[in-house]
A protein has these predicted regions:
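Surface-exposed molecular-recognition determinants
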Residues: 1-161
Length: 161
């Protein structure tokens, strides 16, 4: 879907210097959120996602990955963040997060993300935050290192039809 017709741009951040976490906290009035990342990290690893600064063991995730010659799957429960698609240190990777029903206060929160890197693989992930609170803060960690200078993060809102 084209940006502007369905997606409403909320905020874009392009890093002028490396940092460990990128946060968004000014969004409201949408049904779902889309967070698009294009970047690299200082230590090849999987970025992490947290909501409302919750660092408790309230997150679970699963993934399915493939590289053209093999496939793998895995996951974990009771984690302190949602693990998401792996990024490298030099080849730009892309991750698209779809945060479903983020403001609903009667259901746990789910996120679906897709990730790709030209030198590696494609992966689909699903994550769960076991909390019914509306999401008011999104923290995207670099997975143990830093997001490199030039990495770009764009948050979009989606209105229900």
């Amino acid at each position: 879907m084209a940006a502007g017709s369905t997606y409403t741009p909320i905020a874009t951040t392009t890093l002028g210097s490396a940092q460990a976490t990128v946060s968004f906290n000014s969004f409201s009035g949408y049904t779902d959120l889309i967070l698009v990342v294009a970047g690299t990290v200082s230590t090849a690893n999987n970025p992490t996602l947290r909501f409302n600064s919750d660092s408790g063991s309230n997150y679970s995730w699963r993934y399915l990955a493939g590289n053209g010659s093999s496939a793998s799957t895995g996951g974990s429960a009771n984690q302190t963040s949602i693990l998401t698609g792996g990024l490298g240190t030099s080849t730009i990777g892309n991750i698209i997060y779809h945060i479903n029903n983020y403001s609903n206060t009667t259901t746990n929160k789910t996120v679906i993300n897709r990730h790709n890197r030209a030198d590696d693989s494609v992966t689909a992930w699903v994550g769960l935050w076991r909390n019914t609170a509306a999401i008011t803060t999104i923290d995207l960690g670099a997975g143990g290192g830093n997001w490199n200078t030039g990495s770009t993060f764009t948050l979009y809102g989606i209105q229900a039809a």
